[in-house]
Amino acid sequence: MKQISQSFKALLLVAAFSLPSMAFAAEPAMMKDGVMTDHKGMTLYTFDKDTGGKSVCTGQCAENWPPLMAEAGAKPEGKWTVIKRDDGTMQWAYDGKPLYYFVKDKAPGEKTGDKMKDVWHVLTNSGAKM
């Protein structure tokens, strides 16, 4: 019983030191060289067919254009919002536009999905399409 109590105390100590960093987590993405990227430098895209802060990219579309997922408890701030997808998962949006990756972008900074089928666009620092 004493060993369980010590293990529980250690777990509480780790949790106590972890909470402040979780509460003040950075924005889910950033601007890099004028383009919206995740924190690993992978380019993020918007989809012209999304409207009203709702993602219509599901099924095969979402396999090719994976959403920038939000963790449970993610907090919207400023232009950052969290939308609920049809499957119940949460996705980050910027200025009302759901954000996605492109599966063919393999390295940070690649923008191979930009202007794809004239409906997929890199989000720039002005919020405009590239």
What name fits each language-model region?
Residues M1, F8-L11:
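Generic low-polarity alpha-helical segments
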Residues A10-S21:
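Bacterial N-terminal signal peptides
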